[in-house]
Amino acid sequence: TAEVMSHVXAHFGKALEE
């Protein structure tokens, strides 16, 4: 679902910043 994608995106974005 779009909700899951949004959550995953946020998680990945944070991981990339770290």
Curated annotation (Swiss-Prot):
Keyword Membrane: no
Signal peptide residue numbers: none
Statement: the UniProt record of this protein carries the keyword Transport: yes
One GO BP annotation of this record: sensory perception of smell
Keyword list, A-Z: Olfaction, Sensory transduction, Transport
Tissues where this protein is expressed: Antenna.
Subunit: Homodimer.
Assigned protein family: Belongs to the PBP/GOBP family.
Function: Present in the aqueous fluid surrounding olfactory sensory dendrites and are thought to aid in the capture and transport of hydrophobic odorants into and through this fluid.
Protein name: General odorant-binding protein
Organism whose genome encodes this protein: Lymantria dispar (Gypsy moth)
